[in-house]
Amino acid sequence: MPMISVLGKMFLWQREGPGGRWTCQTSRRVSSDPAWAVEWIELPRGLSLSSLGSARTLRGWSRSSRPSSVDSQDLPEVNVGDTVAMLPKSRRALTIQEIAALARSSLHGISQVVKDHVTKPTAMAQGRVAHLIEWKGWSKPSDSPAALESAFSSYSDLSEGEQEARFAAGVAEQFAIAEAKLRAWSSVDGEDSTDDSYDEDFAGGMDTDMAGQLPLGPHLQDLFTGHRFSRPVRQGSVEPESDCSQTVSPDTLCSSLCSLEDGLLGSPARLASQLLGDELLLAKLPPSRESAFRSLGPLEAQDSLYNSPLTESCLSPAEEEPAPCKDCQPLCPPLTGSWERQRQASDLASSGVVSLDEDEAEPEEQ
């Protein structure tokens, strides 16, 4: 019959018939001084290690049990058939979810330990992080290996706080460089510049190009440099409109046009026919609108000089000068912002379609 001596007590294992359950009973006290180790264990046939664990758990039960003076026959029997229930939670069979969670936590812990104790110190010691952050001169020649080694060693010699501060300073500097590049690109694209400054730059560049490419006559050169068109200004509500633009005689126009190349603006006969066609259009207009269109007559005559879009684009309000032309004198100072209205009126007059909505709206505003 198997017997186990644990904590100074003898445990008697009995089996209830063939194939029955194993029961354990305490018999007598072996010694007055309890021993905390298993003296000897004799397992019956077919008894698994789980039963051994159950026997070990009897250690605490035997100490908290009844006094040893009580006879073993008076003690209740302990059922050890359900060994899993007697095991502690850490020794029970784990489910697949618990095993997966344990594996994940173990893997995470291992990877974190490797990062903290292997990867991070190695990278800091070699200066890779500092080198990537502080390397700003892409176009500069690379330093010698000795210089790089000295930089790496100096970085690794710093304390952890100094390394973090240096790292943060490098990141902030990279952000500042990126922001400066974005501002430079936006200024190159013209997003920050106003329309007026853009027109001034464009007009100045076109004037230099036209002066070097086109063989202009003396009168047209004066027109390009010191001459501007302006809208007529009303002197009063009763008085008729007075033309403030410069009046150019037909002889001056012909002499200026003949100095240009034939391929640029066409033959003088074609321009003369356009001028005559405009005069015929003036005669056919009703009397109520004739006075308004007469004010546009010099404008359309001057606009025939600039049939080419290239020459029209050369004129902008940025080039306005008070010096008059040598063939004509201004009658009144030009108005600010009148260039767009004059261009619209001259385009309408040259195309043969007159829109007097703006001229009719001016008396209402005054």
Swiss-Prot record:
Stretch list, region Disordered: 342-366
InterPro entries attached to this UniProt entry: FAM131
Compositionally biased tracts (Acidic residues): 356-366
Domain of life per record: Eukaryota
Family recorded in the similarity comment: Belongs to the FAM131 family.
Protein name from the UniProt record: Protein FAM131A
Species of the source: Homo sapiens
